[in-house]
């Protein structure tokens, strides 16, 4: 498999508080990597650093043999290849569903209005949101908003998609519709890094699971290894809390 991303010795501090400590891992084309761990373990900060929404304090992020953590790299160009779906959707409330999925294509990728529209319609249909293209975000449910956010990210035709707890802000009955879209993307070979508390998704859909604790990668491996035969006591304790919840 061809390598897309390589994270080398990545650290991130906010003031004196070190949130990420010497993180190393690689992402290959077609990987679905679930990042699990307790709140405050650094999972979301890791994704934000990978997407350059946060500037790493130290370390390197190699994307297709280029260190994008280098200050000379333009973040918006890199982000068109590595998309992100946020917990809180981050849709533009004053724009329709369709326009939300067009604006990035036109501004960043310089696509024509018609090309952006056709591409947006394709991905909105893919996530089941074609009937709502003229709605504003306030007129649709949380699950529908997240499906629009996924379509918006896909419309940029990224090589990698980052998901930051995409279901944690949703009512329980809406979680399934978002996870099903993500499962379909995995089946189609989309490369994904997913910060999640959805353990069934991590176990059933991922090909690799990364367990983080206190800013470090404590354990990683196949879902069968991490869930079925964890090596570290911290991992065992974390998974036991979920099983007993």
Which residues are covered by each model-predicted region?
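C-terminal boundary and immediately downstream tail of ABC-type ATPase nucleotide-binding domains
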Residues: 213, 220, 224-245
């Amino acid at each position: 498999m061809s390598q897309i991303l390589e994270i080398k010795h990545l650290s991130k501090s906010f003031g004196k508080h070190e949130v990420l400590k010497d993180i190393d891992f690689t992402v290959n084309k077609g990987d679905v990597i679930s990042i699990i761990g307790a709140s405050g373990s650094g999972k979301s900060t890791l994704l934000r650093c990978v997407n350059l929404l946060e500037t790493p304090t130290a370390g390197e992020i190699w994307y297709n043999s280029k260190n994008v953590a280098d200050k000379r790299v333009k973040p918006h160009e890199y982000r068109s290849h590595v998309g992100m779906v946020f917990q809180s959707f981050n849709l533009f409330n004053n724009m329709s569903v369709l326009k939300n999925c067009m604006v990035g294509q036109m501004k960043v990728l310089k696509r024509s209005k018609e090309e952006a529209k056709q591409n947006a319609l394709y991905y909105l249909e893919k996530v089941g949101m074609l009937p709502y293209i003229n709605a504003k975000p306030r007129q649709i449910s949380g699950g529908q908003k997240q499906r629009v956010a996924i379509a918006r990210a896909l419309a940029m035709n990224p090589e990698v998609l980052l998901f930051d707890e995409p279901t944690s802000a949703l009512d329980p009955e809406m979680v399934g519709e978002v996870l099903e879209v993500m499962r379909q993307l995995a089946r189609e070979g989309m490369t994904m890094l997913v910060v999640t508390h959805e353990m069934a998704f991590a176990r059933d859909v991922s090909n690799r699971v990364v367990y983080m604790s206190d800013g470090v990668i404590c354990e990683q491996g196949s879902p069968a290894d991490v869930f079925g035969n964890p090596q570290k006591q911290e991992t065992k304790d974390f998974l036991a809390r979920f099983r007993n919840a």
